[in-house]
Amino acid sequence: MRSAQVYRWQIPMDAGVVLRDRRLKTRDGLYVCLRDGEREGWGEISPLPGFSQETWEEAQTALLTWVNDWLQGSEGLPEMPSVAFGASCALAELTGVLPEAADYRAAPLCTGDPDDLVLRLADMPGEKIAKVKVGLYEAVRDGMVVNLLLEAIPDLHLRLDANRAWTPLKAQQFAKYVNPDYRARIAFLEEPCKTRDDSRGFARETGIAIAWDESLREADFTFEAEEGVRAVVIKPTLTGSLDKVREQVAAAHALGLTAVISSSIESSLGLTQLARIAAWLTPGTLPGLDTLHLMQAQQIRPWPGSALPCLKREELERLL
């Protein structure tokens, strides 16, 4: 016997979270809980403002329609990426497809003071990998900060993310301030320039490896082995169903590219599922999931070791 519940939620964010030039004051989303007999599966649907094509309201309408169809026996999935991902996660839990084993390691994310990152990395066991957002300040400053971190911690490897912020000139200004001897320890720089061709040119000219992120969601993108391209960053909330995520990971691995499962600032429930997906599909690759500290609370399922309060389902607004 099938049954379902849908919840709507809103989590206050820390004051300094800025996405695409807009301040994110709250993270808004939905949960779906599917039941079939004794089995249960959860999924999170949380479109990311400025990145997702669909709004929270559109996702809610699509989710409620899909849930009603599922209750009537339908086996299809919604088309909106965030809804398809959340629905497919709930189904994967319900049917036991999504393994319980998780990779709760996370590459620490530096969005502000590099000294904070140095302190966090000092206590980090094993390989030291961190992520730094670049492109928010002057390119020269970004280059100096990256150089400082690589100089201060000799066994550090950095993942950088520019979100297509730079012109070719600005990208070159950044590279100019990174010691050529350190550049090999930049694991990759996500989408440095506004166009793929400019990003490819940057990789050739500087020797700094790049990764595709936004490009994966463009209609003309194809997986290819290219000079200077080392990785793809897969954000499931922006990608779509679990099957589509699996297809992209497989396509990347077939070309020898690193595939990194990455957060779209999901709640703790969504992040714990991403940790399981990473352990399942990209074992041995550190996922990019260090975003929980941007929020003021957890929900339903806590992230191991987090001191943030965790709300229970009874405290959320139920829609169905």
Swiss-Prot record:
Similarity remark: Belongs to the mandelate racemase/muconate lactonizing enzyme family. MenC type 1 subfamily.
GO process annotations (BP): menaquinone biosynthetic process
GO molecular function: magnesium ion binding; O-succinylbenzoate synthase activity
Record field: catalytic activity: (1R,6R)-6-hydroxy-2-succinyl-cyclohexa-2,4-diene-1-carboxylate = 2-succinylbenzoate + H2O
Designated name of the protein: o-succinylbenzoate synthase
Cofactor(s) of this protein: a divalent metal cation
EC number: 4.2.1.113
Regions that span the bilayer: none
Pfam family, one: MenC_N
Entry-linked InterPro entries: Enolase-like_C_sf, Enolase-like_N, Enolase_C-like, Mandelate_racemase_C, OSB_synthase_MenC1, OSBS_N
Source organism (scientific name): Salmonella paratyphi C (strain RKS4594)
Annotated binding of Mg(2+), by residue: D161, E190, D213
Function of the molecule: Converts 2-succinyl-6-hydroxy-2,4-cyclohexadiene-1-carboxylate (SHCHC) to 2-succinylbenzoate (OSB).
Keyword Lyase part of the UniProt annotation: yes
